[in-house]
């Protein structure tokens, strides 16, 4: 599955338990700015009022499973949750979580390769918890020197934070630069 990400593809399981997992490339490709990420005023007010604690990788399987619950099994099926959990166990997939005390209120997960973070999806069980995870992700990626935040497709919600579409060619150029350190270390995409 990492090889697909290195080529700019992302999975969607529309084949059910028996059919193949299909890989896609969107046009335009949705990207979220890292340095120019913006928090809408209404979201900032909500986050100040709720003060979620942001944690990373403390409940990956729970986040992935919660994200699949909103999708009616359309693309994030149990076998993809299992695949992402294996990527997490290998150090490639990560979750960013919004907590209130010991209650997981929201989160997102994605795949990190080099300075690429490819967000898959997010969920919330409390007001602004998904937004808290999104803002937490922006701060984390910025602090760790990430250069490309792939969100696959822009939605009205992500556009409020500055997400925009780029051409597949531009995406592949930015992707190549973001994953170059990993490819240099590993030798080829087939080894990752």
Model-predicted segments: where are they?
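N-acyltransferase acceptor-side catalytic subdomain
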Residues: 1-192
């Amino acid at each position: 599955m990492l090889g697909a990400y290195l080529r700019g593809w992302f999975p969607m399981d529309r084949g059910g338990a028996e059919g193949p997992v299909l890989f896609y490339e969107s046009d335009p490709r949705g990207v979220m700015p890292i340095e120019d990420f913006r928090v809408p005023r209404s979201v900032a007010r909500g986050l100040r009022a709720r003060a979620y604690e942001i944690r990373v990788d403390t409940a990956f399987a729970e986040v992935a499973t919660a994200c699949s619950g909103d999708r009616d099994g359309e693309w994030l099926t149990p076998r993809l949750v299992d695949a992402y959990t294996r990527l997490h166990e290998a150090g490639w997939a990560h979750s960013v979580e919004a907590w209130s005390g010991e209650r997981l209120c929201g989160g997102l997960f994605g795949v990190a390769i080099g300075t690429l973070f490819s967000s898959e999806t997010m969920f919330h069980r409390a007001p602004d918890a998904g937004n808290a995870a999104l803002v937490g992700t922006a701060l984390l990626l910025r602090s760790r020197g990430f250069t490309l935040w792939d969100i696959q497709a822009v939605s009205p919600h992500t556009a409020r934070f500055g997400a925009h579409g780029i051409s597949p060619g531009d995406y592949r150029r930015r992707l190549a630069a973001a994953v170059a350190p990993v490819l240099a270390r590993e030798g080829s995409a087939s080894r990752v």
